Design a protein with these regions (language model features):
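GST-like domain detector, emphasizing the conserved glutathione-binding G-site
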Residues: 1-129, 133
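GST-like fold's C-terminal all-alpha helical module
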Residues: 101-199
Length: 206
Protein backbone atom coordinates (compact mmCIF):
# COMPACT_ATOMS: atom_id res chain seq x y z
CA UNK A 1 0.00 0.00 0.00
CA UNK A 2 1.33 3.44 -0.96
CA UNK A 3 0.14 6.98 -0.42
CA UNK A 4 1.19 9.40 -3.14
CA UNK A 5 1.22 12.67 -1.30
CA UNK A 6 2.79 16.06 -0.69
CA UNK A 7 3.99 17.83 2.42
CA UNK A 8 2.62 20.91 4.20
CA UNK A 9 1.20 23.34 3.18
CA UNK A 10 -0.70 21.17 0.67
CA UNK A 11 -4.08 20.99 2.46
CA UNK A 12 -5.71 17.92 0.92
CA UNK A 13 -2.81 15.55 1.62
CA UNK A 14 -2.61 16.96 5.13
CA UNK A 15 -6.16 15.81 5.84
CA UNK A 16 -5.08 12.23 5.24
CA UNK A 17 -1.85 12.69 7.22
CA UNK A 18 -3.75 13.95 10.28
CA UNK A 19 -6.35 11.19 9.96
CA UNK A 20 -3.66 8.50 9.84
CA UNK A 21 -1.90 10.04 12.83
CA UNK A 22 -5.15 10.00 14.82
CA UNK A 23 -5.54 6.32 13.96
CA UNK A 24 -1.92 5.47 14.70
CA UNK A 25 -1.53 4.07 11.18
CA UNK A 26 1.63 4.07 9.11
CA UNK A 27 1.48 3.92 5.32
CA UNK A 28 4.39 4.05 2.90
CA UNK A 29 4.48 7.51 1.37
CA UNK A 30 5.67 8.49 -2.08
CA UNK A 31 6.59 12.17 -2.02
CA UNK A 32 5.00 13.71 -5.09
CA UNK A 33 6.59 17.13 -5.52
CA UNK A 34 3.93 19.50 -6.75
CA UNK A 35 6.33 22.38 -7.37
CA UNK A 36 8.13 20.12 -9.83
CA UNK A 37 4.76 19.23 -11.40
CA UNK A 38 5.25 15.55 -10.63
CA UNK A 39 1.49 15.24 -10.11
CA UNK A 40 0.97 16.22 -13.75
CA UNK A 41 3.42 13.68 -15.17
CA UNK A 42 1.87 11.13 -17.58
CA UNK A 43 2.74 8.23 -15.30
CA UNK A 44 1.03 9.87 -12.33
CA UNK A 45 -2.00 10.81 -14.42
CA UNK A 46 -2.59 7.09 -14.93
CA UNK A 47 -3.21 6.90 -11.17
CA UNK A 48 -5.47 9.96 -11.07
CA UNK A 49 -6.58 11.51 -14.34
CA UNK A 50 -7.12 14.84 -12.58
CA UNK A 51 -3.43 15.00 -11.65
CA UNK A 52 -4.06 15.67 -7.97
CA UNK A 53 -2.74 14.36 -4.67
CA UNK A 54 -3.33 12.47 -2.48
CA UNK A 55 -3.76 9.11 -4.18
CA UNK A 56 -3.83 5.81 -2.33
CA UNK A 57 -2.58 2.68 -4.09
CA UNK A 58 -4.17 -0.32 -2.40
CA UNK A 59 -2.44 -3.62 -1.80
CA UNK A 60 -4.09 -5.11 -4.87
CA UNK A 61 -2.97 -2.26 -7.12
CA UNK A 62 -6.15 -0.18 -7.23
CA UNK A 63 -6.14 3.61 -6.87
CA UNK A 64 -8.32 5.84 -4.70
CA UNK A 65 -8.31 9.61 -5.08
CA UNK A 66 -9.86 12.36 -2.92
CA UNK A 67 -8.84 12.74 0.70
CA UNK A 68 -12.22 11.95 2.28
CA UNK A 69 -12.63 8.82 0.14
CA UNK A 70 -9.17 7.65 1.21
CA UNK A 71 -9.98 8.20 4.87
CA UNK A 72 -13.30 6.39 4.56
CA UNK A 73 -11.45 3.44 3.04
CA UNK A 74 -9.18 3.24 6.08
CA UNK A 75 -12.16 3.75 8.42
CA UNK A 76 -13.71 0.52 7.14
CA UNK A 77 -10.70 -1.49 8.30
CA UNK A 78 -9.80 0.60 11.36
CA UNK A 79 -13.04 1.87 12.93
CA UNK A 80 -11.54 2.90 16.27
CA UNK A 81 -11.40 5.65 17.24
CA UNK A 82 -14.41 6.55 15.09
CA UNK A 83 -13.69 9.59 12.94
CA UNK A 84 -16.95 9.64 10.98
CA UNK A 85 -19.44 9.44 13.84
CA UNK A 86 -20.38 7.16 16.74
CA UNK A 87 -24.08 6.68 15.98
CA UNK A 88 -26.43 7.57 13.10
CA UNK A 89 -27.09 11.13 14.28
CA UNK A 90 -23.43 11.74 15.05
CA UNK A 91 -22.44 10.41 11.62
CA UNK A 92 -24.94 12.75 9.99
CA UNK A 93 -23.52 15.72 11.89
CA UNK A 94 -19.99 14.82 10.82
CA UNK A 95 -21.09 14.54 7.19
CA UNK A 96 -23.02 17.81 7.42
CA UNK A 97 -20.03 19.70 8.75
CA UNK A 98 -17.60 18.17 6.29
CA UNK A 99 -19.81 19.39 3.47
CA UNK A 100 -20.32 22.79 5.07
CA UNK A 101 -16.59 23.24 5.55
CA UNK A 102 -15.91 22.21 1.97
CA UNK A 103 -18.61 24.33 0.35
CA UNK A 104 -18.58 27.37 2.62
CA UNK A 105 -14.87 27.67 3.40
CA UNK A 106 -12.79 25.52 1.06
CA UNK A 107 -14.50 26.72 -2.13
CA UNK A 108 -13.83 30.45 -1.68
CA UNK A 109 -10.40 29.68 -0.21
CA UNK A 110 -9.54 27.82 -3.40
CA UNK A 111 -10.67 30.75 -5.52
CA UNK A 112 -8.48 33.13 -3.53
CA UNK A 113 -5.52 30.81 -4.09
CA UNK A 114 -6.21 30.37 -7.82
CA UNK A 115 -7.26 33.90 -8.73
CA UNK A 116 -5.75 36.30 -6.20
CA UNK A 117 -2.41 34.83 -5.11
CA UNK A 118 0.72 35.79 -7.08
CA UNK A 119 2.24 32.36 -6.44
CA UNK A 120 -0.32 30.69 -8.68
CA UNK A 121 -0.07 33.24 -11.49
CA UNK A 122 2.77 31.23 -13.02
CA UNK A 123 0.50 28.27 -13.77
CA UNK A 124 -2.68 30.35 -14.06
CA UNK A 125 -1.73 33.52 -15.97
CA UNK A 126 -5.38 34.34 -16.70
CA UNK A 127 -6.39 34.99 -13.11
CA UNK A 128 -9.79 36.53 -12.46
CA UNK A 129 -8.48 38.91 -9.86
CA UNK A 130 -11.82 40.60 -9.16
CA UNK A 131 -13.35 37.21 -8.40
CA UNK A 132 -10.36 36.36 -6.23
CA UNK A 133 -10.80 39.55 -4.23
CA UNK A 134 -14.52 38.90 -3.90
CA UNK A 135 -13.74 35.39 -2.65
CA UNK A 136 -11.67 36.86 0.17
CA UNK A 137 -14.83 38.48 1.52
CA UNK A 138 -16.82 35.27 1.09
CA UNK A 139 -14.10 33.36 2.95
CA UNK A 140 -14.02 35.85 5.83
CA UNK A 141 -17.81 35.70 6.12
CA UNK A 142 -17.66 31.90 6.22
CA UNK A 143 -15.21 32.05 9.11
CA UNK A 144 -17.47 34.46 10.98
CA UNK A 145 -20.46 32.18 10.40
CA UNK A 146 -18.58 29.16 11.74
CA UNK A 147 -17.54 31.26 14.73
CA UNK A 148 -21.20 31.96 15.48
CA UNK A 149 -22.06 28.28 15.11
CA UNK A 150 -19.35 27.37 17.61
CA UNK A 151 -20.82 29.85 20.06
CA UNK A 152 -23.03 27.17 21.60
CA UNK A 153 -20.06 25.91 23.62
CA UNK A 154 -19.40 22.65 21.80
CA UNK A 155 -15.82 21.44 21.99
CA UNK A 156 -15.51 20.23 18.41
CA UNK A 157 -17.12 21.13 15.11
CA UNK A 158 -19.64 18.27 14.90
CA UNK A 159 -20.25 17.90 18.63
CA UNK A 160 -18.52 16.42 21.65
CA UNK A 161 -15.91 14.36 19.80
CA UNK A 162 -13.02 15.13 17.48
CA UNK A 163 -13.89 13.92 13.98
CA UNK A 164 -13.03 14.16 10.32
CA UNK A 165 -15.02 17.38 10.21
CA UNK A 166 -12.46 19.01 12.50
CA UNK A 167 -9.64 17.79 10.28
CA UNK A 168 -11.27 19.24 7.17
CA UNK A 169 -11.85 22.62 8.79
CA UNK A 170 -8.41 22.74 10.42
CA UNK A 171 -6.62 22.09 7.14
CA UNK A 172 -8.75 24.74 5.47
CA UNK A 173 -8.13 27.35 8.15
CA UNK A 174 -4.40 26.69 8.15
CA UNK A 175 -4.12 26.89 4.38
CA UNK A 176 -6.16 30.09 4.42
CA UNK A 177 -3.56 31.53 6.77
CA UNK A 178 -0.82 30.37 4.38
CA UNK A 179 -2.44 32.48 1.66
CA UNK A 180 -2.73 35.43 4.06
CA UNK A 181 -6.42 34.98 4.92
CA UNK A 182 -6.23 34.36 8.64
CA UNK A 183 -9.18 34.03 10.99
CA UNK A 184 -10.85 37.35 11.81
CA UNK A 185 -9.87 38.94 15.10
CA UNK A 186 -13.53 39.04 16.11
CA UNK A 187 -13.98 35.26 15.87
CA UNK A 188 -13.17 34.12 19.43
CA UNK A 189 -15.03 30.81 19.23
CA UNK A 190 -13.31 29.81 16.01
CA UNK A 191 -9.93 30.83 17.38
CA UNK A 192 -10.49 28.84 20.58
CA UNK A 193 -11.53 25.79 18.57
CA UNK A 194 -8.48 26.20 16.34
CA UNK A 195 -6.18 26.33 19.36
CA UNK A 196 -7.71 23.12 20.74
CA UNK A 197 -7.40 21.08 17.58
CA UNK A 198 -3.98 22.50 16.70
CA UNK A 199 -2.65 21.31 20.05
CA UNK A 200 -3.35 17.68 19.19
CA UNK A 201 -0.23 15.62 18.40
CA UNK A 202 -1.67 14.70 15.00
CA UNK A 203 -1.84 18.34 13.96
CA UNK A 204 1.55 19.25 15.37
CA UNK A 205 3.16 16.34 13.52
CA UNK A 206 1.84 17.43 10.13
Amino acid sequence: MKLYTENYPAPNPRKVHIYLAEKGLTVDRVHTKMQERQHKAPEFMKKNSLGQVPVLETEDGKFISESIAICRYFETFHPAPPMFGRDPFDAAMVEMWIRRAEFRLWNPMGQVWINADPRTAIVNPNQFKDYGEHSKKVLANAMKWIDRELGDGREFLAGAHYTMADIVLLCGIDFAKFIHQDMPDDAPNLRAWHARVSARPSARAT
